[in-house]
Regions:
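Alpha-helical transmembrane segments of multi-pass membrane transport proteins
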Residues: 1-414
């Protein structure tokens, strides 16, 4: 049986399991077992036990639960409200006015939380009722929030960058550095779109309110100091070489706890809720990574990635042709799976293919998250589903669900 046929069989089995509602981690491990038993002579039980044990104590992966915990703590603190208060006085004079708060707020919060879901829930809980109350169109408010929340995929310390680094055995610090410029480019593009849209149709944007004096705006900016300290402590310690990503994650947890308590409104009960939520999320991601690692090892025993990479090399495809095919593949896959699942599921197959045509893994990272804007759209559906579950108050929850379908929100973001 040829490798393409084997790969197609395994892909059909995987999608059948996912369509049947099986957990992603269980589906990945089950496909790996099928591949080992049916298409190789390797001892499946020994390979599975060795893989699970070998990948369960990764030092790089230790940063993952810490960054998740930091995001959960910030989600329950008032730092997002303070951030809105500090940004709003400076952005009122720009075309689009306070809609830029969604863009810059998501960018800043993504830089301290590392999670797109936490960014969407936190900034949305604060900005959506405020902007709608001031007369901004709901479509633009939710569209800018949905699009800007995906900045958490790229702006360090992104959780998915850590997963990508572990899956591809790349330096997480280098991945963080590689995500800075593309992330800033996206921030500028999102803000530019808001400005152009407001310039083309001024009736969409409410009239500017009372202009605050310069000293009053400076005074309001003091609320940005805690966020700036957190960014400086986490990102600055990594880029200056004072700490590894794991050490910086631990520092970020300590700083986020201190700042959450010092700004008020944060209690020990909320800290316990953050710990439990971070534990559940970390365990879920850990199981997915173990299943993906087992699948990668199983694919190695079958020889499919190696032979597929050689086949791609013999076809003489240009890098752009391969990227076009991968873009369509990721758009389809992103409609069914979240970002972490897509990364761990496709790495063992896609990485040898892109390396076979001479594409650097770090460049592939940027293409994966920014080089194809349409690639990001399928992620809006699961992300907005999380946003609607977690946003408060309930009145806003009902209003968004009743008036904006996921398809409408995706169209607005697009």
């Amino acid at each position: 049986m040829s490798d393409p046929v084997i790969g197609l069989i395994l892909l059909v089995v995987l999608f059948a399991m996912l369509a049947g509602g099986l957990w992603v981690a269980m589906a990945l491990a089950s496909v790996a077992l099928v591949a080992l038993i049916a298409f190789s002579n390797a001892p499946s039980g020994l390979v599975m036990a060795t893989t699970f044990w070998g990948h369960s104590h990764s030092w790089s992966l230790a940063a993952l639960p810490l960054f998740i915990l930091m995001g959960e703590i910030l989600l329950r603190s008032r730092l997002s409200k303070d951030m809105f208060s500090g940004l709003a006085p400076w952005l009122g004079g720009l075309p689009g006015r306070l809609l830029h708060v969604n863009v810059l707020g998501c960018a800043i919060f993504a830089a301290v939380s590392g999670s797109s879901a936490a960014t969407a829930a936190t900034i949305g809980r604060m900005s959506v009722p405020e902007l709608e109350g001031r007369g901004y169109p709901q479509g633009l408010v939710i569209g800018t929030l949905a699009g800007s929340a995906t900045l958490g995929l790229l702006i360090p310390p992104s959780i998915i960058l850590i997963v990508y680094g572990v899956a591809t055995e790349q330096s997480i610090a280098r991945l963080f550095v590689a995500g800075i410029l593309p992330g800033l480019m996206l921030v500028c593009l999102f803000a530019g779109y808001v400005a152009v849209r407001a310039w083309m149709d001024p009736s969409l944007i409410p009239a500017r309110g009372e202009r605050l004096p310069y000293l009053a705006r400076l005074k309001a900016s003091r609320s940005l100091i805690p966020v700036a300290l957190l960014i400086l402590g986490v990102i600055g310690s990594i880029y200056t070489g004072l700490a590894s990503p794991t050490d910086a994650a631990a520092l970020g947890v300590v700083l986020s706890v201190i700042l959450a308590f010092s700004t008020g409104g944060f209690t020990w009960r909320l800290l316990g809720d953050a710990l439990m939520s971070a534990t559940r999320t970390s365990c879920m991601i850990a199981f997915i990574l173990l299943g993906a690692a087992f699948l990668s090892v199983a694919m190695g025993f079958t020889g499919i990635p190696r032979n597929l990479a050689a086949w791609i090399g013999e076809m003489g495809l240009s890098p752009y042709a391969l990227l076009a095919v991968l873009t369509v593949f990721f758009i389809v896959l992103g409609c069914f799976l979240d970002g972490i699942s897509v990364v761990v599921l496709t790495t063992s197959i896609v990485l040898p293919m892109v390396q076979a045509v001479g594409i650097d893994p770090l460049w592939e990272l940027n293409r994966h998250f920014i080089g194809r804007p349409m690639r990001r759209e399928p992620h809006l559906t699961p992300r907005l589903r999380k946003l609607r579950r977690r946003r408060r108050p309930r009145r806003l929850h009902r209003r968004c669900r009743g008036k904006r379908s996921p398809a409408s929100i995706i169209w607005r973001a697009f």
